Amino acid sequence: MAGMRRLELSEALHLGPGWRHACHALLYAPDPGLLFGRIPLRYAVLMQMRFDGRLGFPGGFVDLRDGSLEDGLNRELGEELGEAAGAFRVERADYRSSHAGSRPRVVAHFYTKLLTLEQLTAVEMGAPRARDHGLEVLGLVRVPLYTLRDGVGGLPAFLENTFIGNAREQLLEAVQNLGLLEPGSFARLKISTPP
């Protein structure tokens, strides 16, 4: 991931006091729905439009003196997503990766959390009442995990948006590793490399 190096969680936790830690979570749920009655949705994946106009995942900076990374992440989820985030808890078992950048000295920890479709829908419905809605978070969006017949609409077009940090790469890695796309469809994606 450009400008960032991957590191093990244990290494990230021992970087020292000059480093800040940010935790974010990809929330997803199986979705049996069909777009236009024929295109399988397969999964619902949430991202958010941030205050700076970029797409990212819910979460934010955490202070290790206040507890674990997960404690901080769950606090951030409550602030950004509202009461429905209290129906689940992101745990260490949901951890995926850590990446460090040197300027600024920030370690980005990434988690994925499987929810039920009902839980995910409750998050979407309650988010406009969350403390940070309209401030840090401008709204939630579902990632289209399909490609339309033109080969551009759907996920390829979505990936042309502007993402914060390495959120685009985290999304692609998670979608592939979790098997959220139809088998073989990831290899057929026409994805441009970001500038």
Swiss-Prot record:
Residues noted as binding Mn(2+) 3 in the record, renumbered to the chain: 76, 80
Gene Ontology CC annotations of this record: cytoplasm; nucleolus; nucleoplasm; nucleus
Keyword Transcription regulation: no
Binding-site list for Mn(2+) 2: 76
Entry binding sites for Mn(2+) 4: 99, 173
Binding of substrate, residues: 24, 50, 57, 166, 170
CC cofactor note: Binds 3 or 4 divalent metal cations. Acts specifically on U8 snoRNA with magnesium as cofactor. Has broad substrate specificity with bound manganese or cobalt (in vitro).
Keywords: Cytoplasm, Hydrolase, Magnesium, Manganese, Metal-binding, Nucleotide metabolism, Nucleotide-binding, Nucleus, RNA-binding
Membership in a protein family: Belongs to the Nudix hydrolase family. NUDT16 subfamily.
Name this protein carries in UniProt: U8 snoRNA-decapping enzyme
Organism: Bos taurus
